[in-house]
């Protein structure tokens, strides 16, 4: 008898999954208060209602499930011939297994299908794994600014398509 490991797939999220996705963001950002400004961490931990509003209001949100649980997510929006990627999160219990890369690659592929001219992302330089992941996929730093509402410096990353 052979046992097969399931291959994770990226799927579009639905409003009925808002609670599971909000729980993922809570887990993914828990403990980051020691590294990042608390305002940034709290903003990255949306409520179920906020996630539901994303799904009903023009954002595309993709998820990865493992063992019946949402373990990764990324959000996309498409303003004026560009794509903005944000809210990339992976459950700490499954980090290091390529799920962040899988989600980011999916989002880049989605942007290509919309004929977006470029993709933008903002990443904290205090999250070197996130910065490295974006750079591995071809993103380059085109600016840095201090997000006053979060009290954190952020890198503006761009991937021309």
Protein language model features and the residues they cover:
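Conserved active-site tyrosine of GNAT-family acetyltransferases
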Residues: 25, 134, 139
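Conserved acetyl-CoA-binding loop-helix of GNAT-fold acetyltransferases
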Residues: 90, 96-109, 132-136
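Conserved GNAT-fold acetyl-CoA-binding loop/helix
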Residues: 26-51
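Conserved beta-strand-loop-alpha-helix junction that forms the acyl-donor binding cleft
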Residues: 95, 121-130, 147-152
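Conserved beta-strand in the GNAT
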Residues: 63, 69-77, 84-89
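A short helix-loop-beta-strand connector motif used in the catalytic cores of GNAT acetyltransferases and
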Residues: 49-63, 84
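A short beta-loop-alpha structural element at the N-terminal edge
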Residues: 6-23
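Conserved GNAT acetyl-CoA-binding A-motif
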Residues: 111-122
């Amino acid at each position: 008898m052979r046992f097969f490991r399931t291959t994770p797939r990226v799927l579009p999220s639905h409003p009925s999954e808002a609670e599971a996705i909000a729980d993922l963001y809570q887990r993914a950002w828990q403990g980051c208060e020691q590294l990042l400004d608390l305002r940034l961490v709290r903003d990255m931990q949306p409520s179920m209602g906020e996630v539901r509003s994303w799904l009903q209001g023009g954002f595309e949100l993709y998820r990865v499930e493992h063992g019946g649980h949402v373990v990764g997510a990324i959000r996309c929006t498409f303003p004026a011939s560009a794509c903005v990627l944000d809210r990339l999160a992976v459950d700490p219990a499954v980090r290091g297994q390529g799920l962040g890369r899988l989600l980011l690659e999916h989002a880049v592929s989605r942007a290509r299908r919309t004929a977006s001219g470029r993709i933008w992302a903002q990443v904290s330089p205090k999250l070197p794994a996130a910065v490295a992941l974006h750079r591995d996929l071809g993103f380059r730093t085109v600016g840095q600014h201090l997000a006053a509402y979060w009290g954190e410096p952020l890198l503006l990353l761009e991937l021309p398509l």
